[in-house]
Amino acid sequence: VGATSTENAIDLAKHAKSTGADAVSSIAPIDAPDDFETALTHYSAIGEATDLPFYVYWFPSSGSTAMTAERFLEGLAKVRNFVGFKFTDMNLYLFNRLVDQSGGELNAITGPDEICAAGMMMGSDGAVGSTYNIMPRIFIEMYESFQSGNVKEAMEAQVKANRVLALLFK
C-alpha cells in the first residue's frame, strides 16, 4: 500500500481488506525513508487500520547504514499484525541477522534479483523480484537446485541471471 501519505496508505489498506486481500505491505514514508521512528509511526497506523497480516517493504536509501537487526525487530514488534518483511537491500549480513534473531517467526523475503541465491543461503522464505517474469526458467532452476541441495548449480543459475541483469542495467 505504497502512498504519498500515511492517510492514503491506510485508505489503500482498508480497500485491500474490502477486496479480499490476504495481507498488506508498505514502504516507509516517501518523504522520510531513512527516519525509522517516522516509519514505525507510519507502519503502526497501517497495521491498526485492518486485521490483515502486515509486511514491511524494507527498501532503505543507499546512504542508510544505521539499521541493526535488534533495532528493526524491536521497533516492528510494536506494529500490530507485523508478520514479515521484503528485504530490498544488498546487506545480506543484516538480512541473515533478521532471520536468525526472529527465530523463524517472521516471513523473510528477499528483493534484489542479483542476490536471490545468496538470499536462499541466508534463510529467505521466498523472493519478490522485478525480472523473474522475463527469465523464469533461470530462477526456477536456481530455486530447484537450491532445494535439492545443489548450491553450486544454484549459484551457476545466479551467474546466468546476473549476466542478463548486467545487460539490462547497462
What is the predicted function of each stretch?
Residues 1-64, 74:
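Active-site beta->alpha loop and helix N-cap motifs at the rims of alpha/beta catalytic domains
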Residues 48-49, 60-169:
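Catalytic alpha/beta core domains of metabolic enzymes, predominantly
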